[in-house]
Amino acid sequence: MFKIGNLELQSRLLLGTGKFENEEVQSKAIEASETNVLTFAVRRMNLYDRNLPNPLANVNLKDFITFPNTAGAKTAQEAIRIAEIANHAGVCDMIKVEVIGDDETLLPDPFETYEVCKVLLEKGYTVCPYISNDLVLAQRLEELGVHAVMPLASPIGTGRGINNPLNLSYIIENASVPVIVDAGIGSPKDACHAMELGADGILLNTAISAAKDPVKMAEAMKLGINAGRLSYEAGRIPVKYTAQASSPSEGLGFL
């Protein structure tokens, strides 16, 4: 359906794999979402020791585009090291650069993020940075050569939806690389809204894994994303300040 770098994504829903109650629920949610992209925190995969538990042991990663992230990194060097671990383990089709700058809000550090992207691009990675909804930063990263930008809707795990749709629209309208909305999506309505703004895709985790029924929510998110994309392509009617009758005025002469 669209590409990030040389990778073809069949679904506009990218699914995070953490926080699921158990492996069965995780597997069913993945199936219901119809995604072909799975993201995961490298530090949770125990890639450096195959004898330790692996939360994706029940998933055949060969069926998916693997999208590891550098969650847990607070510096550029930490993020680069995490990316290299994933790459050496052979589970790094593309990398989500995530460098947290504040422990309370979990907002990304723009300066460290830029440095990570610069190094990983030089090493040949397909790079997708997680950023705040900062148009100028998105533009600078695109100039650097990133393959997609991933602005947040609102802080990670808050489920607040799109806090600043105007800024998000600025990023989408000015980008020539895919825009994947990441973090803060709480419901299919939020996901649909982001897609109606013109986003290329949505990355979800908590909104699905923490739902009362993650499998149903995975399907609901898939439908919301598809509906939002169709709406964007169809083109909504303009917003007006005066009413306009939907029925024609012809035939009223007899009144």
Swiss-Prot record:
**Protein's name according to its UniProt entry:** Thiazole synthase
Q: Where in the sequence is the active site?
A: K96
| Transferase among keywords | yes
Q: In which pathway does it act?
A: Cofactor biosynthesis; thiamine diphosphate biosynthesis
- One annotated GO molecular function: thiazole synthase activity
Q: What does this protein do?
A: Catalyzes the rearrangement of 1-deoxy-D-xylulose 5-phosphate (DXP) to produce the thiazole phosphate moiety of thiamine. Sulfur is provided by the thiocarboxylate moiety of the carrier protein ThiS. In vitro, sulfur can be provided by H(2)S.
Please list the residues that bind 1-deoxy-D-xylulose 5-phosphate.
Answer: G157, A183, G184, N205, T206
The protein's enzyme class: transferase
For this entry, list what GO says about its biological process: thiamine diphosphate biosynthetic process
Reaction catalysed? [ThiS sulfur-carrier protein]-C-terminal-Gly-aminoethanethioate + 2-iminoacetate + 1-deoxy-D-xylulose 5-phosphate = [ThiS sulfur-carrier protein]-C-terminal Gly-Gly + 2-[(2R,5Z)-2-carboxy-4-methylthiazol-5(2H)-ylidene]ethyl phosphate + 2 H2O + H(+)
Question: Chief subcellular site?
Answer: cytoplasm
Q: Name one GO cellular component term.
A: cytoplasm
Keyword Transferase found: yes
* Highest taxon listed in the record's lineage: Bacteria
Tell me where in or outside the cell this protein is found.
Cytoplasm
Gene3D superfamilies, A to Z: Aldolase class I
